[in-house]
């Protein structure tokens, strides 16, 4: 007898690891060669009415078939040893339940097979494997013994074979062989000798029983085959099962073909997930019903457009077909959740109470009248016409003046949600428009993210530091903002990740910037520009008294009103310890004082009830900054001008002197910029050309060199506003006339002697007032700027408005000459 163990016939084995007797490995049937007429009844005549019974777990033995069985139970081991010793046949039956350890008659199928023990193998792991070959079927009538092993009374059953001339049965056997080989080929490349053995085996009893033993079915179905005594009927039933199993194999192969392109050969887990995915497509089922149900419930409450609903439903169906462990599952889930979590057509109700809005804005911010006025105007229009598009405002000005915090107050005044995006250093366009979903880690842009965070479609949206945007090879974010900030386009803003248009027309965008020069012109055109200028000293004192001092007291745990800060003290802090346009540094200085006071309170030391100016040295140290004061008119050529800086207004002295020389030499010192140098040259040329008009001797220009100096040479200075100051200084130097006391001036000049307007008037005027100036000379066109300044800030000042240089000289210079004139 030749014995073959065919590894690749695994598909025809018992289901899998269930084919065990206790601790058994995978069991494979053995294909044997036999004669055409062999009926496997050799030695059957020696079998009596009683025979030893070997119960098998989940295994059914058929006549003629050789089957390896691993023996584990002590009773089974005892039975095998005695049967081998006596060279006797045994009865093999299948248990109904695999878990039964010590079966009785009711636990066994009563139809079994008489078997011969072909070989006993001692395995390396200590287990024992026996090879059994079936002989003839029998009926187990009763169990006569249960110890040391099972024995029972049996009745031998005969198989009915068709006539050899039965062509139908012959065709049936041929079909069974072909189908068996097809099943082998559908799973793997079968060995040629295996195919040859199946095709050329002429023993019909063996062919039928071998196939019955190897079908991938449960023991109950195999037992039904064993019960059938008519071989032809058994073959028909076998063919039915083979056809069914072959269709299943084909379906598995089809599933593998469908998923083959998506399979990563190195990831077994991914392969299994793709199989599950295709199975779910075939069955139309879904194992994530709860999560899908929640998403559908959310979607049912949305007021979104029809096209959005269509996209959502399409993407949700994709999600239904994915397994939770699939790599695409989390990506698809995130996308669907982003769609459903957006506030489609959901708006917070605006508060149209204008007095409430004004109170909120005045409470949180001192000054800023233009900005407040614009917000109140917008609120009034919304009250009258509810569907108006929100304005797009750009607040620009120096740092620390409250541009960003103003946005929060506007949101509170309107009772809208507040969101803020910092654009400083942004250089990737995808941060605005979002990343396309093809990229790993793709997400919505910052606009859509913050709309989702706000939960409404009409928040107050702060685009902070819009002037700090940069661009590189990843695109230009400023260009992406063109769509966001265009009222004619942002009703259909397209985010690359969502790939759906979203309406931003009701969002109130407020951009903040320090420098408009770095913002592209198309972007500037889309925004309403509102300047938030630096605070003057009086405004800083008010802000400190009303906001900063109470805030810092609360932050440092001091009782409200326990320490007072007189306005004079706050004024000294502003002038001597800070130099800024906003109030950030002022806030830090007040916090420093509060820390020292808190330390005293914690140490049970007494603290003053009021902080006086002379106490500031103890808390803040030595004075950090000093402001220029008017120094009189005792020197020819010294004139007081006015300048504007990023931290406010300043007075500016222009000094001109003459020295003996060849003439026509102009020296400029004081770290002057190009524009200021040109103003000095222009002033000298003008008075030279109009020397007679100013009563200047022409010979002075030929024999005297001119030196113009602006003090504080370490500080760069530039701008045209010192034009009339330089003319006055040079005329005073060439005529040795005194300059009028307590007078300052600012204005640009032309070669024709005209005076042009300049900017920063508010800051310059307040700087002059702090320096003790009483009179100011301004361009006639700057008169409109004076009207926008609060009257209390102008008290004690006299303004002279001029349009040409002669008027300036007549107002500024006295007829009286200085002491000890040069000529």
UniProtKB/Swiss-Prot annotation:
Gene Ontology molecular function terms on file: ATP binding; ATP hydrolysis activity; ATP-dependent peptidase activity; sequence-specific DNA binding; serine-type endopeptidase activity
GO biological process terms, semicolon-separated: cellular response to heat; protein quality control for misfolded or incompletely synthesized proteins
Function: ATP-dependent serine protease that mediates the selective degradation of mutant and abnormal proteins as well as certain short-lived regulatory proteins. Required for cellular homeostasis and for survival from DNA damage and developmental changes induced by stress. Degrades polypeptides processively to yield small peptide fragments that are 5 to 10 amino acids long. Binds to DNA in a double-stranded, site-specific manner.
Gene that produces this protein: lon
Compartments, as annotated in UniProt: Cytoplasm
A GO term from the CC aspect: cytoplasm
Expression induction: By heat shock.
The UniProt record lists the keyword S-adenosyl-L-methionine: no
Matching Pfam families: AAA, Lon_C, Lon_lid, LON_substr_bdg
Its EC number(s): 3.4.21.53
Catalytic residues of the enzyme: 721, 764
Self-association and partners: Homohexamer. Organized in a ring with a central cavity.
Disulfide bonds: none
Source taxon at top rank: Bacteria
UniProt xrefs under SUPFAM superfamilies: P-loop containing nucleoside triphosphate hydrolases, PUA domain-like, Ribosomal protein S5 domain 2-like
Species lineage: Bacteria, Pseudomonadati, Bacteroidota, Bacteroidia, Bacteroidales
Keyword Cytoplasm: yes
Family, as annotated: Belongs to the peptidase S16 family.
Residues that, per the record, bind ATP: 397-404
InterPro entries associated with the record: AAA+_ATPase (IPR003593), ATPase_AAA_core (IPR003959), Lon_bac (IPR027543), Lon_bac/euk-typ (IPR004815), Lon_lid (IPR054594), Lon_proteolytic (IPR008269), Lon_Prtase (IPR027065), Lon_prtase_N (IPR003111)
Matches recorded under Gene3D superfamilies: 1.10.8.60, 1.20.5.5270, 1.20.58.1480, 3.30.230.10, LON domain-like (2.30.130.40), P-loop containing nucleotide triphosphate hydrolases (3.40.50.300)
Name this protein carries in UniProt: Lon protease
First-listed, main subcellular location of the protein, grouped into a coarse class: cytoplasm
Reaction catalyzed: Hydrolysis of proteins in presence of ATP
Domain Lon N-terminal: 51-246
